Design a protein with these regions (language model features):
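Short S/T/G/P-rich N-terminal loop/turn motif that feeds into the first structured element of a domain
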Residues: 1-75, 84-91, 112-121
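A short, structured active-site edge motif that brings together acidic residues
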Residues: 105-113
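A common structural junction motif
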Residues: 96-105
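Conserved, mostly hydrophobic/aromatic
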Residues: 79
């Protein structure tokens, strides 16, 4: 049995201690057959030509891309975005929705906005 110790340090990551109001938005997506049939190089080109330029237009958003498909049947990928600007986030979502990302290459399963350790903020 594990002996639980009281928390003596903050669970908030050091890079967020200065701004506890950073939104962490998890976007669960399922790859469509269109995406799965593309070669890896063409997938990279799509991100380089569509997704990355959108992020460059909104530097308030940082994005990471995870691949849980070996562990989950619900989502092929999880996009984790961080921002303090929900207007920038809404713009980014609208732009993705108007591109081949949304519904053509990926089915957006869920969007989960969160705060890190919100109960302590």
């Amino acid at each position: 049995m594990t002996n639980l110790q009281p928390m003596t340090t903050s669970p908030v990551l050091p890079e967020h201690e200065d701004d506890p109001h950073t939104f962490h938005i998890l976007v669960l997506v399922k790859a469509t057959r269109h995406w799965l049939d593309m070669k890896t190089e063409k997938r990279r080109v799509f991100f380089d030509e569509v997704v990355i330029p959108l992020l460059r237009q909104r530097p308030e958003i940082r994005m990471r891309w995870f691949e849980p498909e070996a562990f989950s049947t619900r989502a092929s990928y999880i996009m984790l975005c961080e921002t303090t600007d929900l207007s920038a986030w809404a713009w980014f979502c609208d732009e993705l929705r108007d591109s081949l990302f949304w519904d053509h290459y990926f089915e957006v399963i869920d969007i989960l906005p969160t705060f890190e350790a919100n109960y302590l903020a």
